[in-house]
């Protein structure tokens, strides 16, 4: 399957360097499109030689996040961390969830990375398209509970690559992802190669503002995240969870203009944000890297 499943080939013959295929579903194939083999268990390294060059370049420019494609399990993230340590640099890791194997290991992946991207293009090829909404909601819920930022991406406003207005279904898609608790929504082809890149950003931003206003006006609290607050095996985490929950409860009573957090790594701020308070969270930190990374977290003004 190529280009998010738009083209379908049947492999007839392979050699060490070539693959001969029969075209089942044809169409135009642009450059740099992905290739998927659903249900295949890959034994290749998660990091290719080109990936290594790209990672080294990104780290040399002091990037804040590195998004890792085709993550299968937590060891893929650990391999990336080892490489960054070997290069003498560091960046936060966003794991792109786009393979069936990643869904099977999603909780351990969330535990070892700094954030998750629901990459629905390849995910909708690796799994039936009708299952993608379930996987998206589950991943968002798990990330909310763990206090890890989650990005919902791919084909959110796909029609705006050619049209100045989104479809009603696309507007609903963006809105519902935000209502479900995603920290960020992302454009791909709409802004990278589409005919209306600025307009697409404006539309997505407007939908986000409307969704957030409706959440603020709602008489009910945000959905309670699935958090492991009762885990006494990690005293530091348990105490942080308790303080964050207490902060949230107090904010509901006194309704302050803002919640101010002080943090070095961003840990405290993320744990307050995972409670989804209606009050803006001001993140105070002496660490410039933490300040930039916190821009991705829900409700936080770094």
Task: Show which residues each predicted segment covers.
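Non-catalytic helical/linker scaffolds that mediate oligomerization, partner binding
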Residues: 1-302
């Amino acid at each position: 399957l190529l280009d998010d499943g738009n083209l379908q080939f049947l492999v007839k013959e392979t050699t060490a360097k070539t693959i001969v295929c029969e075209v089942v579903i044809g169409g135009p194939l642009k450059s740099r499109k992905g290739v998927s083999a659903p249900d295949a268990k890959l034994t290749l390294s998660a990091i290719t030689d080109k990936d290594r060059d790209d990672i080294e370049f990104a780290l040399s420019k002091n990037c804040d996040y590195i998004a890792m494609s085709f993550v299968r399990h937590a060891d893929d993230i650990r391999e990336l961390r080892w490489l960054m340590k070997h290069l003498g640099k560091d960046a936060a890791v966003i794991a792109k969830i786009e393979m069936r194997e990643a869904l099977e290991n999603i909780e351990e992946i969330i535990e070892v990375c700094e954030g998750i991207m629901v990459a629905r293009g390849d995910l909708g090829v690796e799994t039936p398209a009708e299952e993608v909404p379930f996987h998206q909601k589950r991943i968002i819920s798990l990330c909310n509970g763990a206090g890890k930022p989650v990005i919902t991406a791919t084909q959110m406003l796909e029609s705006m690559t050619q049209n100045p207005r989104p479809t009603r279904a696309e507007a609903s898609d963006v809105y519902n992802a935000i209502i479900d608790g995603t920290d960020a929504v992302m454009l791909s082809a709409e802004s990278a190669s589409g005919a209306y890149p600025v307009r697409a950003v404006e539309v997505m931003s407007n939908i986000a503002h409307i969704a957030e206003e409706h959440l603020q006006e709602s008489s009910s609290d945000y959905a309670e995240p699935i958090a492991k607050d009762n885990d006494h095996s990690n005293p530091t985490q348990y105490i942080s969870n308790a303080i964050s929950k207490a902060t949230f409860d107090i904010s509901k009573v006194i309704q302050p203009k803002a919640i101010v957090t002080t943090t070095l790594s961003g840990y405290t701020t993320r744990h307050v944000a995972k409670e989804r308070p209606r009050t803006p969270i001001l993140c105070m930190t002496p660490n410039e890297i933490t300040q930039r990374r916190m821009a991705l977290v829900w409700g936080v003004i770094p």
